[in-house]
């Protein structure tokens, strides 16, 4: 049996621009693609932290070192420049490999530079900050 597990995540990237009249896709700085183990044309999920929108599109390469995160085509209606997004990809992992599977987690700063790289999530807080 195979399970669908998180493969890659770019966390809190800033949308740099949106191009409505462009073929649908998400342009991502090639340095970020390498860090997150993503490739051109790979299916990705984009979750907009600012407005709660969630959608699926695919990757196109943006120039290396540019910091570009662009939403194109109909995806451009789902975000605005300056919005924070999470970009995720999933993989089919054989049941036997599940215990050793480690996703690539890329945490961004406000300028779309890599702040931290991890291969496993941190434990969630044990108490709610709202209490």
Curated annotation (Swiss-Prot):
| Entry EC no(s) | 4.1.1.11
Question: Cross-referenced SUPFAM superfamilies, in alphabetical order?
Answer: ADC-like
Q: Pyruvic acid (Ser): which positions carry it?
A: 25
Task: Kindly list the positions annotated as binding substrate.
Answer: 57, 73-75
Pathway field: Cofactor biosynthesis; (R)-pantothenate biosynthesis; beta-alanine from L-aspartate: step 1/1
Q: Which reaction does it catalyse?
A: L-aspartate + H(+) = beta-alanine + CO2
Q: What is its main location?
A: cytoplasm
**Single GO biological process annotation from the record:** alanine biosynthetic process
Cofactor comment in the record? Binds 1 pyruvoyl group covalently per subunit.
Say which enzyme class the record assigns. Answer: lyase
Where are the membrane-spanning stretches? none
Gene Ontology molecular-function annotations: aspartate 1-decarboxylase activity
> Where is the signal peptide, in residue numbers?
none
Q: Which GO terms describe its cellular component?
A: cytosol
The alphabetical list of record keywords is: Autocatalytic cleavage, Cytoplasm, Decarboxylase, Lyase, Pantothenate biosynthesis, Pyruvate, Schiff base, Zymogen
* InterPro entries, sorted: Asp_de-COase-like_dom_sf (IPR009010), Asp_decarbox (IPR003190)
Active site residues of this protein? 25 (schiff-base intermediate with substrate), 58 (proton donor)
Q: Which cofactor does it need?
A: pyruvate
Q: Where in the cell is it found?
A: Cytoplasm
Q: How is it modified after translation?
A: Is synthesized initially as an inactive proenzyme, which is activated by self-cleavage at a specific serine bond to produce a beta-subunit with a hydroxyl group at its C-terminus and an alpha-subunit with a pyruvoyl group at its N-terminus.
Q: Which PANTHER family match?
A: ASPARTATE 1-DECARBOXYLASE
Its biological purpose is as follows: Catalyzes the pyruvoyl-dependent decarboxylation of aspartate to produce beta-alanine.
Q: How does it assemble?
A: Heterooctamer of four alpha and four beta subunits.
What the entry lists under NCBIfam families is as follows:
panD
Family, per entry: Belongs to the PanD family.
This protein is called: Aspartate 1-decarboxylase
What are the leading ranks of the lineage? Bacteria, Pseudomonadati, Pseudomonadota, Betaproteobacteria, Burkholderiales
Designated gene of the protein: panD
């Amino acid at each position: 049996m195979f399970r669908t597990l998180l493969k890659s995540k770019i966390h809190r990237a800033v949308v740099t621009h949106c191009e409505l009249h462009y073929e649908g896709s998400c342009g991502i700085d090639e340095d970020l693609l390498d860090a997150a183990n993503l490739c051109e044309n790979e299916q990705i999920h984009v979750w907009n932290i600012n407005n709660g929108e969630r959608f699926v599109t695919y990757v196109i390469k943006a120039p290396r070192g540019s910091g570009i995160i662009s939403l194109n085509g109909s995806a451009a209606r789902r975000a605005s420049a300056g919005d924070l997004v999470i970009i995720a990809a999933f993989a089919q992992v054989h049941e036997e490999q599940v215990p050793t599977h480690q996703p690539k987690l890329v945490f961004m700063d406000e300028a779309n530079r890599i702040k931290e790289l991890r291969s496993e999530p941190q434990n969630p807080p044990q108490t709610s900050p709202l209490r």
